[in-house]
Amino acid sequence: MDDNNKTQCKECNGWAKEKISEYSEDIPLVIVNRTSVYALGQHNIKEKMNIPLSYFNSYNIEITDGFLNEYSAGLIESACELAKQRPVYITRPIPEMMVDVPNAMARAMMFGKPDPQISISLEEYHARHKVVWAAQDAAVARCGVKILDPLPYLCHDGRCWGSKDGRPIYYDDDHLSEYGNKLLVPMFKQVFAASASH
């Protein structure tokens, strides 16, 4: 990320905060993003693993404790700043698969192979996302943001799965498909139930 991208990122964040502030404070804000990729790099592209996609005062290609602390502090500060205006819900990271799920399933089908059971273990998931979880938990403690956890809807038997009933729930390796995102409807209903009760 060069200085131009850094400037564009700050401008985009400023624009988003301004737009959000135009809405009634009764309307909750739900934050869903790939938070871990910005701190830790890509999860399955070898040449982009362990290279942060974001930086603060100076560009660094190493993941250091200092960088992770600064990144976490930024996440907490941003969430708490937004929570001054309205209820804020932060979504825990969506599990990232190591392969393009629909492509792998289609390839297996083309060659008459059994449906591949694409998944990652909960241990792998938590190892990848522990920094983000800790920052999210700190934001809950500091300013009362709420957490939306997709794991009960996407993971079972100690694993997070790339498909359900023979259908991919991702449209690549880390973005949920239309079919997959419908699995999270009960999770998001919490937001609307809480909003309706106020």
Regions found by a protein language model. Give the residues of each.
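Extracellular glycan-modifying ectodomains
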Residues: 1-198
